[in-house]
Design a protein with these regions (language model features):
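NAD(P)+-binding Rossmann beta1-loop-alpha1 motif at the extreme N-terminus of oxidoreductases
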Residues: 1-59, 85, 90, 121-124, ...
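Hydrophobic beta-strand scaffold residues
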Residues: 23, 43, 111-113, 156, ...
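Helical "substrate-binding/catalytic lid" subdomain
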Residues: 164-278, 282-285
Length: 287
């Protein structure tokens, strides 16, 4: 497991170890992965050490640069993997990034699965992620990764060849990030108009307009509680991937372009906070 010290990766590695898998965990900041030893995981010093002889190598890292460094950089995992083993790539790295990883896997005769997830810290801890799985249809390979997915998530969607998972993840991220930014702006507007922002949720309660996720993030904004479940810096990265895919598809989607710019602006000051901290970019300025 590469990326075992992040918010998502640590929870996922712990659940795999608790489910009886032999987990070798690596993280760039080793100290963040050390706690996994309490669940029986071996904490490796390099990606290559974690991957050596493994049937499956799972990557859950911040971005394509981190994935490339862990897999193909100094002491990278890919050179230590046996031909016929499996690379389970679960980071959100977009279409182009997924294509690059698939090419690297093919070069080393490693089976490649593209399986990003829908969910943040709490679903990861509770094994309630939605797995957007795509990759080889070979039953022997899928039989190896299916139990891993079942230890991590509540729902597994098989979507076709590698790349399909990342494409659906981009579409779903477009929805999630739009909801969060919309929540931030309507709360800021309510406050600027002298209203108690809780009235928004009181008015929506019980109607078809009452989105649970909007309520979850919106109430965090009203409490000014920005403990990270998913960092704003990563939300900005994902929004840029969405915008890039829209442009590659020849679409003019100004809302998503503006969303990407807005989240990038917020991440400059509040990148380590939860993505709901995008509210701080819009919040009325106090004298």
């Amino acid at each position: 497991m590469l990326g075992a010290g992040g918010i998502m990766g640590q929870a996922m590695a712990a659940n795999l170890a608790r489910s009886g898998f032999d987990v070798r965990a690596w993280n760039r900041s080793r100290a963040k992965a050390e706690i996994l030893a309490l669940d029986g995981a071996f904490v490796a010093g390099t990606p290559a050490e974690a991957a050596d002889g493994a049937d499956v190598v799972l990557t859950m890292l911040a971005d394509l640069e981190a994935v490339a460094a862990a897999m193909d950089g100094r002491h990278g995992a890919i050179a230590a993997m046996d031909p016929g083993s499996i690379w389970l790539q679960m980071s959100t790295i977009g279409e182009a990034g997924t294509g690059r990883c698939a090419e690297l896997a093919a070069k080393h005769e490693v089976a490649f699965f593209d399986a990003p997830v829908l969910g943040t810290r709490l679903p990861a801890e509770q094994r309630k992620l939605v797995i957007l799985a795509s990759g080889p249809a070979t039953s022997s390979l899928r039989d190896l990764v299916q139990p891993i997915f079942e230890a991590l998530g509540r729902k597994i969607l098989w979507l076709g060849p590698a790349g399909a998972g990342s494409r659906l993840k981009l579409v779903l991220n477009a929805w999630v990030l739009t909801v969060v930014e919309a929540g931030a702006e309507i709360i800021a507007l309510a406050e600027a108009l002298g209203l108690d922002s809780h009235l928004i949720f009181d008015a929506l309660e019980g109607s078809n307009l009452d989105l649970p996720y909007l309520r979850l993030k919106g109430e965090a904004m009203t409490r000014r509680d920005f403990e990270p479940a998913f960092r704003l810096s990563l939300a900005a990265k994902d929004a840029a991937l969405v915008d890039d895919s829209a442009r590659r598809a020849g679409l003019d989607l100004p809302l998503l372009k503006t969303l990407s710019d807005r989240l990038a602006e917020g991440a400059k000051q509040h990148g380590d906070k939860d993505m709901s901290a995008t509210y701080l970019t819009s919040a009325p300025k106090t004298p």
